[in-house]
A protein has these predicted regions:
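N-terminal amphipathic/basic leader segments beginning at the initiator methionine
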Residues: 1-27
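Hydrophobic core segments within long, regular secondary-structure runs in both alpha-
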Residues: 12-16, 89, 142, 146, ...
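Short, amphipathic C-terminal "tail helix"
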Residues: 304, 310, 316-337
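Mobile late-domain/C-terminal helix-loop "cap" segments
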Residues: 264-313
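Mg2+-dependent prenyl diphosphate-binding active-site environment of isoprenoid biosynthetic enzymes
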Residues: 28-263, 333
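Hydrophobic alpha-helical core bundles mediating ligand binding, dimerization, or RNAP-core interactions
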Residues: 15, 23, 40, 120-121, ...
Length: 337
């Protein structure tokens, strides 16, 4: 048993080393898919915060369990799942860059990117099932893992479905945020870690109660960065969400706050893609700001974050787990990328 208690940076390094070893083994076993595996490795090396592995890891440690190679392997599997999700998301959005590098879609087209994403998903399944936990623990964790996969796909579908609705409501947008990112990014990773640890149901419920508002706050921060962030830090153009016509909470709040010609302009231009000029982007961003939608979204984000902190304080955790989850809460909501 070891007392190793990694910082977020140290944990990322450990997870990345595990991913590199895992992919090297898969490349040796399946050389025919070598190009696809190299592409998965390229995407992982491009960056990413590794928040999903971190929440899984600390969901496990929250139950009083020590650091182990098995939990690192399980946590790392969630980064492979995330790779699947973002590669397919880039296809649907026809995105050219992510994390400051070309997307798989931009490099090889739809067929190549589909196969990269599909293989990442298969590898994610392999990694979590090969993590050396007892079968009962794996069964409980895989139930949460299965929910995670289903929810991100359902959320993505709703996101695509709403793209043609200029009058999407805030309630609808929040539902998509919870499914597409909130539960998938935080709540389910915590549940997977807790299940692997055999955590009591009271702790599992407490972690879920903490993760739910935090997950939604995480997505709201992502939406704000997509419009008002610094592209040199986010790794993607800050006009991409506007050109693609993202129907997120920020959009819904703006539409609800505008009226008359301003509202007509906003709904007509938002999502107009390559037809938008630089002045149109500035105009749309200004409408989002002057309508009060940006401030209202920030206010909702802060309220959700406060709820998450309050629920975290009520959990019976040791100092290491509490400190790590507090740091992850800040990382999820105060980030600039």
């Amino acid at each position: 048993m070891t007392a190793f208690s990694p910082t977020l940076g140290e944990l990322r390094n450990v997870v990345d080393a595990e991913l590199t070893d895992f992919l090297a083994g898969r490349r040796a076993a399946l050389p025919e898919a070598g190009e696809l595996i190299v592409e998965i490795q390229r995407l992982l090396e491009a960056g990413g915060k590794r928040l999903r592995p971190a929440f899984c890891y600390w969901g496990y440690r929250a139950a009083g369990k020590p650091h182990s190679a098995a939990i690192v392997r399980s946590a790392a599997s969630l980064e492979l799942l995330h790779t699947f999700a973002i590669v397919h998301d880039d296809i649907m959005d026809q995105s050219s860059t992510r994390r400051g590098v070309p997307t798989s879609f931009a490099l090889g087209g739809v067929s190549f990117a589909l196969l990269v994403g599909d293989l990442a998903l298969v590898f994610a399944d392999d990694a979590i099932m090969a993590s050396d936990f007892p079968p009962p623990a794996l069964a409980g964790a895989f139930a949460a893992y299965s929910r995670m996969r289903q929810e991100v796909i359902a959320g993505q579908f709703l996101d695509v479905k709403m793209a043609g609705d200029p009058l999407v409501t805030e309630e609808e947008a929040r539902r998509v945020a919870v499914l597409k990112s909130g539960r998938y990014s935080i709540q389910e990773p915590l549940a997977i870690g807790a299940a692997l640890a055999g955590a009591p149901s009271a702790l599992e419920d407490g972690l879920a109660g903490y993760g739910e508002p935090l997950g939604e706050a995480f997505q709201l921060r992502d939406d704000l960065l997509g419009i008002f962030g610094d592209s040199s830090r986010t790794g993607k153009p800050i006009d991409s969400d506007i050109r693609e016509g993202k129907r997120h909470v920020l959009y819904a709040k703006t539409v609800a706050s505008l009226s008359g010609g301003e509202r007509d302009d906003f709904t007509r231009l938002w999502g107009a893609g390559a037809d938008l000029g630089a002045e149109d982007i500035v105009h749309l961003r200004e409408l989002t700001e002057c309508s009060g939608a940006r401030a209202a979204t920030e206010g909702l984000l802060k309220a959700l974050t406060a709820t998450a902190y309050e629920r975290l304080r009520g959990l019976p955790l040791d100092g290491d787990a509490r400190g790590a989850l507090e740091a992850l809460t800040r990382e999820s909501t105060d980030r600039q990328s």
